[in-house]
């Protein structure tokens, strides 16, 4: 697909060689075909496309992933301007293998229905999901969500949704939020299923693209990239976050209460460099392995330091990632979210509404936050961006049932390796191309 293959090569080369001069390749990677029947049947290219769609697509029009790991390359010698001359038929089947995502979706008291809606909007049979309602939620609310998951025939069939039944006590802005994220990551690793990226979301997050869009674009990326918004320019946070020492009672009490400050202050660390950024991220499996297993002591040491740090979710993973030599060159400086902040930012972002719809779409981000429960803008996103019916799963290439009369197309399950990217994939491609560009990629890593 456009430019991403050359960026893929560039990223890989940089990870093996720290000093490399940038150059632009003429290699153009083909994208997984957007399914439109050719209008000019008489042309050679149209015949080729027709051949491609009849041999590689499912009856529903999705694209069948084939067991190859390299993207198709439209390569060729000479200066012909026609794409036909650059197509090598023997490479038609060389589609990249689809990635798999592992999601944590977390919520608190009153978030059960919102969490369920976010889960349905994000669901794909090949992904993994951990959901968590913290201990501030009622037992009835947690049991209702657990019953919904347990009784879903779809979730039972694919066994890929796990609810943390023994709820954690999570203190806002405290290290217990980091502990909860690490807990979910450990569950996903223990299950042993194949997944490539760990994405943490809350019940007030919502997708702006389908999973097919996300799978399509990420299939062209190196699996060790870490999408995390970060900076070492901590500014005012040095005096208000790094130097104060806080205690999170959630670490040792059964009942929830707010963090509190101790009178003693501490100096800025010299054993490692502090980084800060967004609490929302997409982390590679190798990096999650590193954080959980801690074969190098850095993740463990930094975790203990951040147990007394205000808003530790905005610093822990960032600091580990950028102080670990084997991972610092894998960062992409983005949280993949559209978030509307005040300038300068306050503790909470704005709640998104219908008036933000155009800005959300134009951001090209795959996720957005924060949404109020059942806000009308969520219905608009479902209708215009996800093609999702009320109470249904976002349809993908694996859904082969009828849409007629409000029917759920995912009630009939087809091949789960078939994906059908839509307009959201175009937007996401623009975002990723920008993030991996010469001016945005290396120059913004761990700075």
Swiss-Prot record:
GO CC term, one of those recorded: Golgi membrane
MF annotations from Gene Ontology: glucuronosyltransferase activity
Subcellular location: Golgi apparatus membrane
Membrane topology category: Single-pass type II membrane protein
Xref: Pfam families: Branch (PF02485)
Transmembrane segments: 34-54
Residue spans, topological domain Cytoplasmic: 1-33
GO biological process: unidimensional cell growth
Glycosylation sites: 151, 200, 329, 405
Disruption phenotype: Increased cell elongation in hypocotyls and roots from seedlings grown in the dark.
EC number: 2.4.1.-
Keywords: Glycoprotein, Glycosyltransferase, Golgi apparatus, Membrane, Signal-anchor, Transferase, Transmembrane, Transmembrane helix
Enzyme class: transferase
Statement: the UniProt record of this protein carries the keyword Glycosyltransferase: yes
Domain of life assignment: Eukaryota
Residue ranges that the UniProt entry lists as topological domain Lumenal: 55-447
Task of the protein: Beta-glucuronosyltransferase involved in the biosynthesis of type II arabinogalactan (AG). Modifies both the beta-1,6-linked galactan and beta-1,3-linked galactan present in type II AG. Transfers glucuronate to beta-1,6-galactooligosaccharides with degrees of polymerization ranging from 3 to 11. Transfers glucuronate to beta-1,3-galactooligosaccharides with degrees of polymerization ranging from 5 to 7. The addition of glucuronate at the O6 position may terminate galactose chain extension. Required for cell elongation during seedling growth.
Family to which this protein belongs: Belongs to the glycosyltransferase 14 family.
Protein name: Beta-glucuronosyltransferase GlcAT14A
Species for this entry: Arabidopsis thaliana
Gene name per UniProt: GLCAT14A
